[in-house]
Amino acid sequence: MSGSFWLLLSFAALTAAQSTTEELAKTFLEKFNHEAEELSYQSSLASWNYNTNITDENVQKMNEAGAKWSAFYEEQSKLAKTYPLAEIHNTTVKRQLQALQQSGSSVLSADKSQRLNTILNAMSTIYSTGKACNPNNPQECLLLEPGLDDIMENSKDYNERLWAWEGWRAEVGKQLRPLYEEYVALKNEMARANNYEDYGDYWRGDYEEEWTDGYNYSRSQLIKDVEHTFTQIKPLYQHLHAYVRAKLMDTYPSRISPTGCLPAHLLGDMWGRFWTNLYPLTVPFGQKPNIDVTDAMVNQSWDARRIFKEAEKFFVSVGLPNMTQGFWENSMLTEPGDSRKVVCHPTAWDLGKGDFRIKMCTKVTMDDFLTAHHEMGHIQYDMAYAVQPFLLRNGANEGFHEAVGEIMSLSAATPNHLKTIGLLSPGFSEDSETEINFLLKQALTIVGTLPFTYMLEKWRWMVFKGEIPKEQWMQKWWEMKREIVGVVEPVPHDETYCDPASLFHVANDYSFIRYYTRTIYQFQFQEALCRIAKHEGPLHKCDISNSSEAGKKLLQMLTLGKSKPWTLALEHVVGEKKMNVTPLLKYFEPLFTWLKEQNRNSFVGWNTDWRPYADQSIKVRISLKSALGDEAYEWNDNEMYLFRSSVAYAMREYFSKVKNQTIPFVEDNVWVSNLKPRISFNFFVTASKNVSDVIPRSEVEEAIRMSRSRINDAFRLDDNSLEFLGIQPTLSPPYQPPVTIWLIVFGVVMGVVVVGIVLLIVSGIRNRRKNNQARSEENPYASVDLSKGENNPGFQHADDVQTSF
């Protein structure tokens, strides 16, 4: 037989083998899909029950259902790895196997997997049940929602905002710190066992595509694209930042630096994530009708159900389906009126088996009106890709899922749409001033959050990669916050805090870069859909409601789920394969032009050195080596604790003796910042149990003067080696080390020896005087002539004749 025949036969055998493998894989996946649907549903339902009723019983049921699902998935993942991907040509089968071959947390040992699950549950519970108490009324302890969020959204009281901001982080962040350290270690171990560099790399894997014809995309490319688009957005953000800073100076005179960063607790919510609630303070043309329709909603007696019904109408108007009957029956759209503890953070749920729900403690505000559109956008995506196999029921990437609802929010927020649904009066007319008002409100929500999102995820990526040691987490967090976002901490935070975890998404193990990518995608989608809807005019005035053509195009993309690369899905709608920030910049172009004119005489950018507490801070310099030489000790956390305690003691003494007040200052009331390795730092003092009540620097200086010697003695230093800059030295004597027992014994012994020597010397002198006196009377050796070589018998060589001590 010829060689070509054998080659053909081998190829046929190989093709048959591949065909057999592919058919077996299809059969395996069909069986998996059937079983996974039920087990996943039971796990999701138990999780829903826990999130809407936080009890020990429900967490136990959630853990049990989750364990069953995890065990099943682990087993199926191992089986999936027996099907070589190289032998699979059907892309739908191949993408399912690729997904299932990722083992997730099941690669961990049983003990570690259980510990990780315990940590995640604990972090979620701490976040959902944490409270902060009003220092002026300690019995008033508030949950985040409702309670603390109301303060952070509405209060203009600097100090009230500060105690709420700090109280949340001290109560929640500090509890989460040790858990988050374990979480990072375990998640990294899981990611590396799944062949990723670290957990951040694992998250970025959601964007990775192995495809042909230019549709491939790498994890490293995501980092490059995010950084590149951020440099393009930054000029717009810097001008928005400068404008907001000038307006905050009007509201909080003397509290804001005209060239510095913005205090983190003044930015509209608990995290400074969205600046939406700053609109009343920053509205450019206040005489114009208010485009925040919250008051109109209240006056028209809107409630949560009406809000979601209006959102549903919007989606239906573009040809997308109604919500299911089960959605309306099973969703939690308001906070329960009973005593149940719930997770209020808005989330959309695809439990499986056609069961779609939203969980949200809705309030009658324009912000929640837009949030309802966002969450319902998730549900529309879930319903659209329900036609896909179980493993492909997901967004093309995580950013796509977040973007869908935001597309609708862009249209729903326009004055034209608000007039259509009766929230703006029919007589409302748009002009250049109302246009700027509208765009500024949009920018506070959309542009203001981008650096926040970018910086948070950049910090987490660096933490997972090991580029920030845990001993420097908070130090680096606030360095990056100041440098990238232009936001400064209102009080310094040490390494006992975990400020990132005070945000829902961090405490609950969500990737966060999705909120950055979604913002880029949503404007790309909006521009494309507006073009399909035949919109004419500026992009920011486009309302795609009632455009069935736009809805049809969107639905085609939603139905794909994860069956195709996201690059292909993006191209299907917008005509390009990559993120492009140009539509976003085009949307805000009129505002950017206006902001540059407004900021013409203002400083644009921020000085990262300024701190809100700088005026009341005292700088300390410590010179251990020069003072103690080889006996110098190491300055560490324990020494800093002693310093803070010493200052607290000085404050107690001062208030007791000078002001006749008994105030229980403790070390936590002494706030240290700007610690340098050569031992210098700043500190200030707040009242006991009230971080917003800063003790005037002058009183702290008086307290230090009163107790200066005690403080010096605690560290074996003096005024020259323990310097409080700006406080005159007390001229107290240099430190005298305490006398120890062995020195006393040594002194006594040496004293006895010296006395003995003195006595011997005295007695020797007396004897010589007697001998000299005798020789002067008669010299027995006077006849000896030494010049003739005669020996003097009075000179003895023997040692025993010498006087000894």
From Swiss-Prot:
| Residue ranges of the region described as Disordered | 771-805
Residues that bind substrate: R273, H345, P346, Y515
Q: How is it modified after translation?
A: Proteolytic cleavage by ADAM17 generates a secreted form. Also cleaved by serine proteases: TMPRSS2, TMPRSS11D and HPN/TMPRSS1.
List where the motif LIR lies. 778-786
Q: Which GO terms describe its cellular component?
A: apical plasma membrane; brush border membrane; cell surface; cilium; cytoplasm; extracellular space; plasma membrane
Region: Essential for cleavage by TMPRSS11D and TMPRSS2, residue numbers: 697-716
The segment(s) forming the Peptidase M2 domain are 19-607
- Collectrin-like domain: from which residue to which, for each copy? 614-805
What cystine linkages occur within this chain?
A: C133-C141, C344-C361, C530-C542
Q: Which residues form the active site?
A: E375, H505
Q: Which positions in this protein are listed as binding Zn(2+)?
A: H374, H378, E402
GO terms assigned for molecular function: endopeptidase activity; identical protein binding; metal ion binding; metallocarboxypeptidase activity; metallopeptidase activity; peptidyl-dipeptidase activity; transporter activator activity; virus receptor activity
- Spell out where the chain is glycosylated: N53, N90, N216, N299, N322, N546, N660, N690
What is the name listed in the Swiss-Prot or TrEMBL entry for this protein? Angiotensin-converting enzyme 2
Gene that produces this protein: ACE2
